[in-house]
Design a protein with these regions (language model features):
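N-terminal localization/anchoring segments of enzymes in phospholipid and broader phosphate metabolism
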Residues: 2-585, 603, 607, 617-744
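Short linear/disordered segments characteristic of secreted peptide precursors
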Residues: 16, 751, 764-766, 770, ...
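Short, strongly patterned local motifs
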Residues: 743-744, 752-776, 818
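Cysteine-centered motifs
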Residues: 775, 786-787, 812
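Ala/Thr-enriched low-complexity intrinsically disordered regions
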Residues: 12, 40-45, 765-767, 783, ...
Length: 826
């Protein structure tokens, strides 16, 4: 591994990890040879089975978007069964799987269901399935995945039991425990319940989205009745401790369900279960905006209220229910039997985070703590603007800290030479330092223009509140373009220097969100390139005029000039093959659904262009299909961090073109949103991105390769195991300057540095106390104070302020000791 003059790491040259896992040259076909082989074999392999739906022939290299997403969510679930993942983190993956599935049903299944109601004749454009055909497959696969989740969850809870925490059912309790639970229910739960028997004078109630309800079939003298009891998460603690001080818990909904006979004491309970409703979230915003008497922001608030009232799309239940109850619930909720899902696991997994809190002191049950590092490209003693003027800077999250970009904004907010800051915001943190910096800039007299996308799904309320605060501070807030979301991540800082107007431009792949920057992998480019600044300024100007950019020279900007330029760049690689040269395409993105780009990639593959793609989620293109995509490889990486960066590579070095982008290769991104992809002109950064891409392709721990049948499997580890995310963090920790405390550097790195501080101060304390001739209890008291300071210190490990404050305390302690020593002598 070499470090070049610009302190960028070359991870491709002489890298033993890549060399060990690299495919032998003899096994690799050149683009030209692949082209000859394809001609010899014909354009279609005889063993490829063709499918016809309606009047359409389905190519075997296409996959349905929704079914591909379900495969992705299964890969998330597979992480929960990976024994190399710490136990509590495996519980997290079960929770993520369930949350993902909830959102999938709310958004995607809800949309497909709406389409089916309008017309079931329309077919999607890749596998030509109708809406009803898609729903049938989705429901079938969902039930299979729920069984798999149940098996994994039960296994995990058996392991959790070994660490002293257990979730138990009522029938597993002892008599004393049952008596205690009955008293708890009577005194703490029953007075807060709102039970209801359904009848003519008591109509079926509105069931809130994703709330748990206890339902039962009651036998009465005249006829059977259905009753419902809300198990409100806002009222009750989800986990009820069975015996104070024990690690045995019961879910509140299970406790309520058990005591249904007590709640409805005048009836006989024939059957009972817990249910949970998922409501559609697919809403036509344009219908709300038709009211011209209210503002855009008020329209969005109205949409949020309306979304909670949309029709149910799914019902889950936890016990075998009487068919009469299921039919009645389906009728009231306007659901079909296929939209009901039985599962024995809890219906909501938010409680796993409370279990994790109970086990937080067991470090082996969690991922090793990782802290984003300051990039080696940045000198913390120099202004950010001055550094970016000298060279482009690339930040790689979460391995490198977002603090450097925030410092750039804070610097711009107070710099008297800065005239304006323009920025797009899609999803921001609840306590956003980014927005606070923009507010400070406006209050300091800068022109601050912020494009806030209020239509960021499920983040609308947060964006509405921040837009109000920024507006009150003097920022100019705009809300984008009708029918076109602004999803680009761009920031433009304009300032005067040497009687000239200059610019600093930032283009990123992810949101300006401090929280997700520690959880998602993203790239952020900061540059003083005036060509890029000019086109980013044009993007902002067009948005302000409710228009879109029609033509660019450097950037790729959707909806008008991204898809067409990507196709043009792919054509360039095809032309290289015709000229006898090597063609190459590399893509990293979250999803691939754009059929125009997919068809062009199939063409490139058939011409002999080598195509490597790292696609975390949906891929409507199946790799390795004979006669179609033989020269295409697709790998999905699902690990500790959510893969989120987008990279486009065209050609081999040194003539390659590399872009980082906010856009996935999805039709919604390339033709229905404002997205920006920025070219990388700095050679050191290009080399770094190529190296990162190659490491991801070599990932044989968290990477899963797509097979020609559309399924995914992990590569067999023949050389060294490569976890790309761990590799990048080790690189950040090893090659970058990890901040340590000078006073404890001589201790082994295996010691946690906080422990080193305690030990050092413990020794120092007793040595000084002995010198002063004091009794040992003073040393013990001082050690206790050291420990207390350490706890405070540990909570603020990232804060430089606390770091320097503790050093100051330490210095004061030392001075105090010296004064006491002098006093003792006197």
């Amino acid at each position: 591994m070499e470090i070049n003059k610009k302190n960028e790491i070359d991870v491709t040259e002489n890298n033993p990890i890549i060399e060990k896992n690299k495919v032998p040259q003899s096994e690799m076909k050149s683009g030209l040879q692949e082209k000859k082989n394809l001609k010899a074999e014909g354009t279609k392999a005889e063993n490829v089975k063709e499918v016809v739906r309606g009047k359409h022939k389905v190519l075997p290299c296409y996959d349905n978007r929704e079914l591909s997403w379900l495969k992705f969510n299964e890969r998330v679930l597979d992480e929960a069964s990976d024994e190399d993942v710490p136990l509590c983190e495996r519980l997290t993956f079960v929770s993520i799987f369930s949350t993902n599935l909830d959102e999938f049903y709310r958004v995607r299944v809800g949309s497909i269901y709406d389409q089916m109601i309008i017309s079931d004749k329309k077919r999607e454009n890749k596998t030509y399935m109708t809406s009803s055909e898609q729903l049938e497959r989705i429901f079938k696969i969902t039930k299979e995945l729920l069984k798999k989740k149940e098996h994994i969850y039960n296994g995990l809870m058996k392991e959790v039991k070994n660490y002293g925490v257990q979730i138990v059912n009522f029938d597993k309790l002892s008599k004393e425990e049952k008596d205690g639970m009955e008293n708890y229910f009577k005194n703490n739960v029953m007075p807060l319940l709102s039970p209801q028997v359904i009848g003519k004078k008591h109509p079926f109630p509105f069931l809130n989205n994703q709330e748990i309800y206890a339902v039962a079939l009651l036998e009465s003298k005249n006829n059977d009745k259905i009753c419902i009891v809300p198990c409100r998460s806002s009222v009750f603690n989800r986990l009820v401790q069975i015996v104070p001080g024990s690690g045995r818990y019961m879910l509140i909904e299970e406790l309520i369900l058990h005591y249904m006979p007590m709640i409805f004491e005048n009836y006989t309970v024939k059957s009972k279960s817990l249910i949970r409703i998922t409501r559609n979230a697919d809403i036509d915003i344009d219908e709300i905006f038709a009211d011209e008497d209210i503002s855009y922001r008020e329209s969005m608030e109205e949409m949020i209220r309306m979304r909670t009232k949309l029709c149910p799309i799914r019902m889950e239940y936890s016990r075998v229910l009487d068919e009469k109850v299921i039919r009645s619930l389906c009728k009231e909720l306007n659901l079909k039997k296929e939209q009901t899902f039985h599962q024995e696991t809890p219906l909501d997994f938010d409680f796993v985070f409370k279990i994790q809190d109970m086990l937080r002191n067991r470090k082996e049950l969690f991922f090793k703590r990782r802290i984003p590092q300051v990039s080696t490209a940045i000198d913390k003693t120099q202004p950010m603007i001055d550094q970016i003027e000298k060279k482009d800077i690339l930040l790689s999250y979460p391995f490198e800290s977002m603090t450097s970009f925030i410092n750039l904004l804070k610097e711009a907010a107070t710099d008297p030479n800065v005239a304006s800051i323009k920025m797009t915001l899609y999803r921001v943190a609840k306590n956003s330092q980014v927005v606070e910096a923009l507010i400070d800039a406006a209050e300091n007299g800068k022109e601050v223009v912020v494009m806030v996308e209020l239509r960021a799904r499920f983040d609308e309320q947060n964006n509405i509140e921040w837009s109000r605060r920024m507006e009150d501070a003097g920022c100019r807030i705009i809300y984008g373009i009708d029918h076109t979301k602004v999803h680009s991540k761009i920031c433009l800082i304009s300032y005067k220097k040497d009687n000239q107007v200059k610019h600093i431009t930032q283009v990123g792949t992810g949101n300006y969100n401090e929280k997700t920057s520690k959880l998602y992998t993203d790239l952020s480019l900061m540059t003083a390139n005036e060509d890029i600044a000019k086109e980013v300024a044009e993007v902002f100007n067009k948005i302000c005029l409710e228009q879109v950019v029609e033509e660019t020279e450097h950037l790729l900007v959707s909806p008008k000039c991204m898809q067409s330029k990507i196709v043009e760049l792919i054509d360039n690689e095809i032309e290289k093959i015709a000229e006898g040269k090597e063609g190459y395409i590399g893509f990293k993105c979250n999803s691939l659904t754009d059929k125009v780009i997919i068809k062009k990639l199939i063409e490139a593959s058939n011409k002999g262009v080598k195509v490597d793609m790292v696609i975390r989620g949906i891929s409507c293109l199946i790799a390795g299909v004979p006669g179609y995509t033989e020269n295409i490889t697709i790998k999905s990486i699902v690990g500790r961090y959510l893969e989120h960066s987008r990279i486009y590579i065209f050609g081999k070095e040194p003539l390659d073109k590399i872009y980082i982008s906010s856009a996935d290769l999805m039709t919604r991104n390339t033709v229905r949103r404002v997205e920006v992809a920025a070219p990388i002109y700095d050679e050191a950064i290009k080399k770094r991105i190529r190296g990162m891409f190659n490491i991801m392709l070599s990932d044989n721990v968290k990477g899963r390769r797509m097979k020609p049948n559309g399924k995914y499997c992990k590569d067999e580890i023949t050389g060294e195991a490569i976890n790309s995310q761990e590799y990048f963090f080790e690189e950040a920790y090893g090659e970058h300057k990890v901040e340590k405390y000078w006073m404890v550097n001589w201790f082994p790195d295996s010691f946690f540095f906080g422990s080193k501080v305690i030990l050092w101060r413990f020794i120092f304390s007793f040595s000084v106390q002995s010198r002063l001739g004091r009794c040992p209890r003073h040393g013990v008291q001082y050690t206790y104070d050291c420990c207390r300071n350490y706890v405070s210190y540990e909570r603020n490990i990232v804060s430089h302020v606390i770091y320097w404050r503790n050093l100051w305390y330490f210095a004061c302690d030392y001075v105090s000791f010296e004064v006491n020593a002098v006093s003792h002598v006197i």
